[in-house]
């Protein structure tokens, strides 16, 4: 895997077309995600976004990474807040690239079924509108809804 990422890095460095650079970064992110190197995969997905801000697929990939990593706390309700962060990325994907709306909406529907119940959040002192920072490698803040 490291060798293939090295080839991607070389291609990204040599490429002058920003859209192609974005595509290389996105493909590298997919390879890393498939090999469970999530933090590094997210770095490449973010690079893909830097090179082409109008593509929604990198945001969808990041959302899928988050949804595959919901266990960062001993508190189940907090873990389920990870799905809010994933949904945030899917909303962003739709806003920058309407062509991915159908795929994003399907995932939003799926991930919404895994978000915490109001009563579970209540028991740990969290309510709708509060912000939660997702732990572990994700490290992003999201709003409870």
Language model features with spans:
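Residue-level recognition of tetratricopeptide repeat
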Residues: 1, 18-21, 54-58, 100-101
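Short coil/turn linking the two alpha-helices of tandem helical-hairpin repeats
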Residues: 16-19, 30-36, 63, 68-78, ...
């Amino acid at each position: 895997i490291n060798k293939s990422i090295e080839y991607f890095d070389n291609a990204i460095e040599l490429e002058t077309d920003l859209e192609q650079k974005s595509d290389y970064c996105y493909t590298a992110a997919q390879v890393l995600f498939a090999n469970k190197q999530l933090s590094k995969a997210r770095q490449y997905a973010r690079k893909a976004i830097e090179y082409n801000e109008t593509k929604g697929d990198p945001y969808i990939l990041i959302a899928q990474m988050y949804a595959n990593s919901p266990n960062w706390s001993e508190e189940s309700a907090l873990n389920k807040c990870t799905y809010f962060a994933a949904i945030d990325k899917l909303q962003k994907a739709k806003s920058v690239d309407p062509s991915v709306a159908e795929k994003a909406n399907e995932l939003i529907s799926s991930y919404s079924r895994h978000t915490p119940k109001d009563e579970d959040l209540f028991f740990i002192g969290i309510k709708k509108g509060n912000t939660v920072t997702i732990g572990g490698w994700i490290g992003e803040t999201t709003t409870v809804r």
